[in-house]
Amino acid sequence: MTSTVQRAATTRHAYFHDSDAPVATVVVPAAFVAVRWRGGRLLLVRRVESGAWEFPGGRVVVGESAEEAAVRCTARAAGVKVLITGLVGLFTDPAHVVRSEDGEVQQQFAALFHARAVGGEPHGDARETSEAAWVAVADLRGLPMEPAVSSWITEALSFDPLPHLG
């Protein structure tokens, strides 16, 4: 399944179990958080380059743990300070690749954590995220979202005591 969201002059393509997907040239470690708020709403961000909604997070940089990256990236991209409370899972499916706007083809390798908000108000950073919001589960269907992210949301909402692996 291919997900292409075009905004302005940039295009980002996400492929999820798509026979037309390009071959990845790099594995990109990333960390994201699933934060639930009153009424079961989820913290989501809207990416500037694709227009798609996803959990806040980003790349793990040299010298930091996945948990540190998740906390850092969530504060930057969503304006919310979080405390990691558990692991939803590791999402390492080699059939999930993204061709970024610069042409790099990345195999996704993502850690998704449960977290709770401990400060801040949702807002985009205007560089990577145009918006951040608490979104009701009932409103998720109408949002532009990559297929892999939809599966991550399903896992995050399942409250399975065993983390997803794969």
Give, region by region, the residue ranges found by the protein language model.
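Short, solvent-exposed loop/turn segments at secondary-structure junctions
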Residues: 25, 52-53, 91-97
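Short, well-ordered beta-strand micro-motif
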Residues: 34-35, 112-116, 136
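Acidic, metal-coordinating catalytic segment for phosphate/diphosphate chemistry
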Residues: 2-32, 103
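Nudix hydrolase/Nudix homology domain
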Residues: 51-53, 122-166
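A short coil-to-beta-strand element that immediately follows conserved catalytic motifs
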Residues: 81-91
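Active-site-adjacent beta-strand/loop module that shapes the phosphate/pyrophosphate-binding cleft
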Residues: 93-121
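A generic structural micro-feature
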Residues: 25-27, 101-109, 126-129
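Conserved Nudix-box catalytic region and its N-terminal flanking loop in Nudix hydrolases
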Residues: 37-77
